[in-house]
Amino acid sequence: MAKDYVTGKKTTFGNKRSHAMNSVRRAWKPNLQKVRILVDGKPKRVWVSTKALKSGKVTRA
């Protein structure tokens, strides 16, 4: 999976736990969207998390 260009978020791994505390490996993926942003004044198409988009850490091109 891709990595967030701004915050560096990527897939994290851990265990899913049932009520009986049985464990199964699983992955948590960030909500990434491919958007055009301004990097050094030029538009660039990169993967950005929706959290970074909502918080205003990115200026769209």
Swiss-Prot record:
NCBIfam families according to UniProt:
L28 (TIGR00009)
For region Disordered, the annotated ranges are 1-21
Q: Which domain of life is it from?
A: Bacteria
BP GO terms, sorted: translation
Query: What protein name is recorded for this chain?
Result: Large ribosomal subunit protein bL28
Q: Which UniProt keywords apply?
A: Ribonucleoprotein, Ribosomal protein
Q: Which GO terms describe its cellular component?
A: ribonucleoprotein complex; ribosome
For this chain, the family text in UniProt reads: Belongs to the bacterial ribosomal protein bL28 family.
- Keyword presence, Amino-acid biosynthesis: no
InterPro entries per the UniProt record, alphabetical: Bacterial_rp_bL28 (IPR050096), Ribosomal_bL28 (IPR026569), Ribosomal_bL28/bL31-like_sf (IPR034704), Ribosomal_bL28_bact-type (IPR001383), Ribosomal_bL28_sf (IPR037147)
Q: Does the keyword Ribonucleoprotein apply?
A: yes
Q: Which organism is it from?
A: Lactobacillus helveticus (strain DPC 4571)
